[in-house]
Each structure stands twice: as structure tokens, then as C-alpha cells.
Regions:
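Signature for HUH/AEP ssDNA processing cores
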Residues: 1-52, 59-71, 75, 145-168
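Generic secondary-structure boundary/loop-capping signal
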Residues: 4, 39, 57, 87, ...
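Surface-exposed beta-strand edges and their flanking turn/coil or helix-capping segments
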Residues: 30, 54-55, 71, 110-113, ...
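Catalytic "initiation/cleavage/transfer" segments centered on a nucleophilic residue
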Residues: 62, 77-147
């Protein structure tokens, strides 16, 4: 099942760039080329020159944990252009489909075979990568917050609390 707490790790950073200005595809490709790491980029189904939409795949040097994924993805989006990113693209559980295009659309595909992106380097760009207030955020987005963990069933708790809940 695709649930946030079921993700064990990611080997790719996947960024959906859905807010590219009209005619901005070449600019994004130049930004990616300047990163000096391996990447693959392709247009998504709704891509048009007047409304470009690209998906960027960045292979990682090691599997990053679900907790490491979001700060790594946000750092890379910041380097490419945070304002271009879709707000949900940083979620480790986000499902991505195979590339496809309509028969009348313009298909974009580029890749560069270089060094894989170092997870440890990305995390080292933060003073403390656990501090979500230091992560790059989308312009105009609400402050970042970690969702609270799901509370357990009070009837299955141990000790005094569990006994109280089972009685009352």
C-alpha cells in the first residue's frame, strides 16, 4: 500500500516541475546541466510549450531513508528553482507513473550520465537537517510541519493508562 509510513527508502529524487513559465523548458535544462550530477528529465502528460511540465529524476549515491528524502528533495528543488516545483513533489510516498505523451504533444527527454548525487552531501548543506524550519520552502507556502504520528488504540495501551481506558 502507498502510505507515508510504509516507505523504507528512495534511490531517486523525483521532482515534478509544474510551474515553469511559458517557453522555460530550455532554462530548466540549462539549470540541470549546471548541477554536474547525473539526471534524467522528461515531459509529463500535460506538457505544452506554453505550459511546460517536466519530471526530473536524480539518482542517489545510496538509498536515503524516508526521513532524509524530503530535505534532500527540497535542497535539489532549491538549486534548480524552488518556484518551479509542485507542492506535493517532496513527499517520499508520492507515486510517479511511466512517461507518456499525447499524440499531439511535444515530448521532451534528456539525460546526463554523471556521478550520482550524494545524499550525505545534500544533508550536509543543512546545519541540522532534522530542523524542518531550515528546509527550503515554496514561495507563499504555509510553514512546514511534520504530521503527528497516529495515536494507538487506547484499549491496547499498557500500564495504568491502558487499565483506565479498558475500564472506562
Amino acid at each position: 500500500r502507498r502510505k507515508a509510513n510504509a516507505v523504507t527508502g528512495r534511490d531517486l529524487i523525483t521532482l515534478d516541475l509544474d510551474n515553469i513559465p511559458a517557453g522555460g523548458t530550455d532554462d530548466v535544462l540549462r539549470r540541470l546541466e549546471a548541477l554536474n550530477c547525473g539526471y534524467c528529465v522528461y515531459s509529463t502528460r500535460k506538457h505544452m510549450p506554453a505550459a511546460p511540465r517536466l519530471r526530473v529524476l536524480l539518482p542517489l549515491s545510496r538509498t536515503c531513508s524516508a526521513d532524509e528524502y524530503e530535505p534532500c528533495a527540497r535542497r535539489m528543488a532549491d538549486l534548480i528553482g524552488m518556484e518551479l516545483a509542485d507542492q506535493t513533489t517532496f513527499e517520499a510516498c508520492r507515486l510517479m507513473y511511466w512517461p507518456s505523451c499525447s499524440s499531439d504533444s511535444q515530448y521532451v527527454f534528456h539525460y546526463t550520465d554523471r556521478e550520482m548525487l550524494s545524499v550525505d552531501w545534500l544533508l550536509s548543506t543543512y546545519e541540522d537537517w532534522h530542523d524542518i524550519t531550515s528546509w527550503p520552502a515554496l514561495p507563499g507556502a504555509a510553514a512546514l510541519a511534520r504530521p503527528a504520528a497516529k495515536q494507538g488504540d487506547p484499549l491496547t495501551k499498557s500500564g495504568v493508562v491502558g487499565a483506565f481506558c479498558r475500564v472506562y
